[in-house]
Amino acid sequence: SRPELDAKRVGCMGISGGGTVTTFAAAVEPRIKVAFVSGYLNTFLDSILSLSHCIDNYVPDILNWCEMYDVAGLIAPRPLFIESGDKDNIFPIEASVESYKRVKKVYETIGSPELVQQEVFDGEHSFWGKQGLPFCAKHLKA
């Protein structure tokens, strides 16, 4: 820990590969208080395993254990914001929306549906931030 940081206000955000890192890091690191995943939440079958990706996207035999939305569900009960471009050619929007619904069910089950949100924006595989940045600011407010 670092004395100049407020441990109650640590967030993590990233797009694409950064969304991968954010998802997995927030799933296992409880010191991350808010996660903002851009251009990543989907299914492994519809995205990572359907195209040729860089090697750091592959977790051997992961489908024997879980799907991408299962990993994202481990972030609960901490706030999670997900954004997806409706024309993303790497992470198809249909699978992103379906995966979000599955993550939302986790938050509903624990009684905190307001702590997870998704924004689908008009765009490709890019960062948007219009609703996500205010969401993070709200949940990291001192």
Predicted regions and their residues:
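Short glycine-enriched nucleophile-adjacent loop
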Residues: 1, 19-30, 136
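Short, glycine-/Ser/Thr-/acidic-enriched flexible segments
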Residues: 18, 42, 87-88, 124-125
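Gly/Ser-rich "nucleophile elbow"/oxyanion-hole loop immediately N-terminal to the catalytic nucleophile
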Residues: 1-16, 32
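Short, conserved active-site loop motifs that form the nucleotide-linked donor/cofactor pocket
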Residues: 10, 80, 115-117
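C-terminal catalytic histidine-bearing segment of alpha/beta-hydrolase fold enzymes
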Residues: 101-142
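Conserved strand-to-loop "acid loop" that flanks and positions the catalytic carboxylate
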Residues: 76-91, 121-123
